[in-house]
Amino acid sequence: MDQKKIDSLVKACRYSFISNKKNYCGTTDAFSEFKDFIENPLPEKTNKIETLFMSFEALYPYLKLIAKANKLSPLDEKVVDAYWIGNELLEKVSLDETKEMILADFVKPGLLPKSIALKKAESIPFGSVPHHSFHVLFINFVSRKVEPVLKNLDSCLISWGKIKEVKENSLVVDSVQLVFDSGEFKLKEKRKAIDSGLVSGAEKNSFVSVHWDFAVELIEKQQLKSLKHFTEKNITAVNSFL
């Protein structure tokens, strides 16, 4: 078994763990399988994990979209990284391809009504890329389980935090908060306490990615730079549409 494939699935499990635990997306209780795989990433478990990801009706279409444009598989390490953190693969996806994905994959019972999907597909902001921040800020939530209010958009967005204090079950981080001010989205600096999540070995002044106030993974400075870049790129694009 290719170690890169296992590493990719571990990363995918980390980013989808908390939203599934909250029952917002994916097969009910997939998070328990994800946690088990993160802690014991054995090759014989990979097929089941891959199948579970296919049940994520918002996430998996983006992975397929990015993969197809770059001639890779949906759960390739670079594809998973592109969607959650951001990398050069995103620039290979055309707006037309994103439009086709919205109409083909998001129009179904329990997701978007056709009228809303058409409206979204026809008005994709120029300069946007199919990063998780695009889904949060422009598509909002295809599931009716989550109300598209600012607090939820902020929580769902993958943010970052510089660790200032390590506690028993939480981390105090200097992070950012999504706000809506003067008719546009902005990121505002905010110190907050988050669940230490699945992160071990956290140290003061290291960086973590954050999803639903839950620490996802420790990230390097280049990952931090990419996450900021693609998040801010989509904020700028969506603001031009508002």
Question: Predicted segments — roles?
Answer:
Residues 1-73:
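N-terminal low-complexity, intrinsically disordered tails enriched in Ser/Pro/Gly
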Residues 2, 27-29, 42-48, 55, ...:
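Serine/threonine-rich low-complexity intrinsically disordered regions
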Residues 7-10, 32-35, 39, 50, ...:
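Generic detector of well-ordered alpha-helical segments enriched in charged/polar residues
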Residues 39, 43, 54, 58, ...:
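Generic surface-pattern signal
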Residues 67-100:
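Long, low-complexity, serine/threonine- and charged-residue-rich intrinsically disordered N-terminal tails
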Residues 89-154:
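Anionic-ligand-binding alpha/beta catalytic cores of soluble enzymes and soluble regulatory domains
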Residues 157-160:
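Conserved beta-strand residues within beta-sheet cores
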Residues 162-242:
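C-terminal, beta-strand-rich globular interaction domains
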